[in-house]
Amino acid sequence: MKTVVITGASKGIGLATAKKFLSEGWRVIGTYLDAPILIQDKNLIAIQYDQSNPESIAKVSEKIKEIASKLDALINNAGILIDAEDETANPVKVRKTLEVNVIGVVDLTERLLPLFEKDSHIVNLNSGHGVISKPVLDDATASGYRISKAALNMYTRHLAFRVESRGIIVSALAPGWVNTDMGNIIATETEKPDREPEEAANDIFQLVTTVKETGQFWKLGKKTEW
């Protein structure tokens, strides 16, 4: 049985992704912060996890190593958006966002790297807000979130380069505007998310199980610009 680690698996895209992998016969190690993972399945192992806390990251990574001798996939889904309406860069919020969306991802991933073998897949959930090739930004909001996702994109490329010789595939994936708690933060009466978590989960599963090209940024099943 193949094993996947999914962070932030108690709601939204993470929950839908956990359900998708379980339905396909995978064992899922899912992490949650506060709310439990409301799935009844013998192949789900739920672990409480705080991605902003180095001690929690160290503890959870060791627990995962006790559970699994190898990993077939890691879905770095957990993240925060706390400056959606801010049009200035608040240093406190930027620092907090980087701790969760970048440092936490790097810390957990690096600790788990020994468990990955040829054809295993690491997926970093990203966003169009992390794209730096746009000639002009849409607006000045969410600076911390944008910065964090741009940094995560570079980590994705850097990691892909480092582990390519081991046959490990590393990808970034932007799920689009999804109907989740985070996605609805910026929704209005006239503009709302146009995708459901299950659609994003299908994209993630297809990426993990079919794509062999490493170091790419994916959106809606196609490669996109960094």
Located regions from the model:
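Active-site Tyr-X3-Lys motif and surrounding loop/helix of classical short-chain dehydrogenase/reductase
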Residues: 59-63, 85, 92-99
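Rossmann-fold cofactor-recognition segment
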Residues: 42-55
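Conserved NAD(P)H cofactor-binding loop of Rossmann-fold oxidoreductase domains
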Residues: 77-83
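N-terminal Rossmann NAD(P)H-binding glycine-rich loop of SDR-like oxidoreductase domains
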Residues: 10, 14-19
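Conserved glycine-rich Rossmann-like NAD(P)H-binding loop of the short-chain dehydrogenase/reductase
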Residues: 24-38
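C-terminal helical subdomain
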Residues: 165, 172, 187-226
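Catalytic loop of short-chain dehydrogenase/reductase
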Residues: 87-91, 95, 118-165
